[in-house]
């Protein structure tokens, strides 16, 4: 092929001023084939990089967003400027309009400057990931990374726009393309080279030196997993090789540009045309190298490349799978946003409907310990401190109260009702006539038509008092009459089936306040028959159901007949034995009751629940 003359048309190109250089035909053919290969590898390789990042979840990270951006920048020259270069090489000159020449120069500038700026962004991303790993997630979040990407391309456009003046981008017959005419303004040319090439090289070099120092300092097999360390080193090497190849490919043309811009008259005739051609083609060839480097050095990219190659055998399935992957990714993002929104709404509703803290009001009840609590192994009862109210105990009281038999009393026929209590009983014949019962450390509740006592002490004046500890299924206890005029101090024992009188005297309790009639309402009588001593002569002897106790009975034989020979003790033994088996483990404390029946012939059955919060009478 002979030398191609410049097109004699007013296109304002360098070819109109400079003659077309005479290249050997073999060199023209070689350059043409190399450019075709560059275009094919550029388009296919960078497309595969974009598909690999899109399809592989391991490659979907903020750092690879700049890798995709770099692939897009490399593809720009393969779409428009390189095909027009092939056209100029085939005809031996430029026969297109000046507008197309300006577009070729502008797109070429976007590709070159965009590539170097994206390489800088990749280096900064790797630097933050390795040297500032704690702040990496905050600095390079998805939102921030997208903002950085937009800023990168805005800077690229702003850097290329000054070259769009008419006359600065012209056709160069030595390279068969439209480039920036550095002969028109040498100062501007040096400034562009420093901003577009030298400064990015310094930034990227600093980042990779720091990264390499950090990697060498962290190469401790005992402190880090060797596999993770090797992966980081390979990732670093991949990015470093890409930077190194870019610097090597674009360094010759930038050096020639600066030399010609500084001394155009001296250097213009000394630089051969083939050197210009080789420098430009090396720079163009860099656009297809990035995809090859990813496939050679990055295992994830290499594996995804093989997947794409195998899928290319069935294009329909491949593109349908790609579309489905994109839809799944969009659905996953939508679902993630919906879940986050629902979670935020649930938290707001929980805060709005949060129940206030339950405040427990302490009971104003003076706890008086029962005698023998400390000896029986109940220090909490003997200490006098109330137990905290709990829902479990309330539930127990509620369930236990449903099984309890109502407390009843038999009044004598003459009176028909109980006489109200008015202080202590009057002492007669030197014997105490008051009955003092120390309640357990809680308020005393009388079940079923009875009075609720909350005083420090409770004084009873019935003929006899019987205590039965409550269980989960309490058994009824039938009250019995005690003959009038008898008085005794009875101590209940598990060893005997009936109480025996004792001659001991108990001094009435004086340390507690004496209740009055106003403190204790008049109890209601029950619907049971009211037997008297005349109707039931067998009840003249004092006896009660056998309740297990702790101490042995000691009684006075002169006042009461022998209970063992009493005929009334016979019918009570079966009930007592059954009650003893049910309550021997539940009776907490020995209870001593002093009774006197000078004025009343009533019998009161007291039902005591073995509950830490109440005692039912």
From Swiss-Prot:
**Alphabetized GO MF terms:** G protein-coupled receptor activity; melatonin receptor activity
Q: Where is the composition biased (Basic and acidic residues)?
A: 341-353
Q: Output the PTM entry.
A: Cleaved by CAPN1 in a calcium-dependent manner.
User: What InterPro entries does this protein's entry cite?
Assistant: GPCR_Rhodpsn, GPCR_Rhodpsn_7TM, Mel_rcpt_1X, Melatonin_rcpt
Q: What is this protein called?
A: Melatonin-related receptor
On assembly, the entry states:
Homodimer, and heterodimer with MTNR1A and MTNR1B. Interacts with KAT5. Interacts with RTN4 isoform A/NOGO-A. Interacts with TGFBR1.
Gene3D superfamilies cross-referenced by the UniProt entry: Rhodopsin 7-helix transmembrane proteins
Query: What organism, scientifically named, is this protein from?
Result: Homo sapiens (Human)
Coiled-coil segments, which residues?
none
Tell me yes or no: is Cell membrane among this UniProt entry's keywords. Answer: yes
Gene Ontology cellular component list: nucleoplasm; plasma membrane; postsynaptic density
Q: What is the lineage of its organism?
A: Eukaryota, Metazoa, Chordata, Craniata, Vertebrata
Disulfide partners: 101-178
SMART domains per the record? 7TM_GPCR_Srsx
Give the record's keywords alphabetically. Cell membrane, Disulfide bond, G-protein coupled receptor, Membrane, Nucleus, Receptor, Synapse, Transducer, Transmembrane, Transmembrane helix
Segments spanning the bilayer are: 31-51, 65-85, 104-124, 144-164, 189-209, 240-260, 274-294
Gene name for this UniProt entry: GPR50
């Amino acid at each position: 092929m002979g030398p191609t003359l410049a097109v004699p048309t007013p296109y304002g190109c360098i070819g109109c001023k400079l003659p077309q250089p005479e290249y050997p035909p073999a060199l023209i053919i070689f350059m043409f084939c190399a450019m075709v290969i560059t275009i094919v590898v550029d388009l296919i390789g960078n497309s595969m990089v974009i598909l690999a990042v899109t399809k592989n979840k391991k490659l979907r990270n903020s750092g690879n967003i700049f890798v995709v951006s770099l692939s897009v920048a490399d593809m720009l020259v393969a779409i428009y400027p390189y095909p027009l270069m092939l056209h100029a090489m085939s005809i031996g000159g430029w026969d297109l309009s000046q507008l197309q020449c300006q577009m070729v120069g502008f797109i070429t500038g976007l590709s070159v400057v965009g590539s170097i700026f994206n390489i800088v962004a990749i280096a900064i991303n790797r630097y933050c990931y390795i040297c500032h790993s704690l702040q990496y997630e905050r600095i390079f979040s998805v939102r921030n990374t997208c903002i950085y990407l937009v800023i990168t391309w805005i800077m690229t456009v702003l850097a290329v726009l000054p070259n769009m003046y008419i006359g600065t981008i012209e056709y160069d017959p030595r390279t068969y393309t439209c480039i920036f005419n550095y002969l028109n303004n040498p100062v501007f040319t040096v400034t562009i080279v420093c901003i577009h090439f030298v400064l990015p090289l310094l930034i990227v070099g600093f980042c990779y030196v720091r990264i390499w120092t950090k990697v060498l300092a962290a190469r401790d097999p005992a402190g880090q997993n060797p596999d993770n360390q090797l992966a980081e080193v390979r990732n670093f090497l991949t990015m470093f090789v890409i930077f190194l190849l870019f610097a090597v490919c674009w360094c010759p043309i930038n050096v020639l540009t600066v030399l010609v811009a500084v001394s155009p008259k001296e250097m213009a005739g000394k630089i051969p045309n083939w050197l210009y051609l080789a420098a430009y083609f090396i720079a163009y060839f860099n656009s297809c190298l990035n995809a090859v480097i990813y496939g050679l050095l990055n295992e994830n990219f290499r594996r995804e490349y093989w997947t794409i190659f195998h899928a290319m055998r069935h294009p329909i399935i491949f593109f349908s799978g790609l579309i489905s992957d994109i839809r799944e990714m969009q659905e996953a993002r939508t679902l993630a946003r919906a879940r986050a929104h629902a979670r935020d709404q649930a938290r707001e509703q929980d805060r709005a409907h949060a129940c206030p803290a339950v405040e427990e009001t302490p009971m104003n009840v003076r706890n008086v310990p029962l005698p023998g609590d400390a000896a029986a192994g109940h220090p909490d009862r003997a200490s006098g401190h109330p137990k905290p109210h709990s829902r479990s105990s309330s539930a127990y009281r509620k369930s236990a109260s449903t099984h309890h038999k109502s407390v009843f009393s038999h009044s004598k026929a003459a009176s028909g009702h109980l006489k109200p209590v008015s202080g202590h009983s009057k002492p007669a014949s030197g014997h105490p006539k008051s009955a003092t019962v120390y309640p357990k450390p809680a308020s005393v509740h009388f079940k079923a038509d009875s009075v609720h006592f909350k005083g420090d002490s409770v004084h009873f004046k019935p003929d006899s008092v019987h205590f039965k500890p409550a269980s989960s299924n309490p058994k009824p206890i039938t009250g019995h009459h005690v003959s009038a005029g008898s008085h005794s101090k009875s101590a209940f024992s598990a060893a005997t089936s009936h109480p025996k009188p004792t001659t001991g005297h108990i001094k009435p309790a004086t340390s507690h306040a004496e209740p009055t009639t106003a403190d204790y309402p008049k109890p209601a009588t029950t619907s049971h028959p009211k037997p008297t001593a005349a109707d039931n002569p067998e009840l003249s002897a004092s006896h009660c159901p056998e309740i297990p106790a702790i101490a042995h009975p000691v009684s006075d034989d002169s006042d009461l007949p022998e209970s063992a020979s009493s005929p009334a003790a016979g019918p009570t033994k079966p009930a007592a034995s059954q009650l003893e088996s049910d309550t021997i483990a539940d009776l907490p404390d020995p209870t001593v009751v002093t009774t006197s029946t000078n004025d009343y012939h009533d019998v009161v059955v007291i039902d005591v629940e073995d509950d830490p919060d109440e005692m039912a009478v």
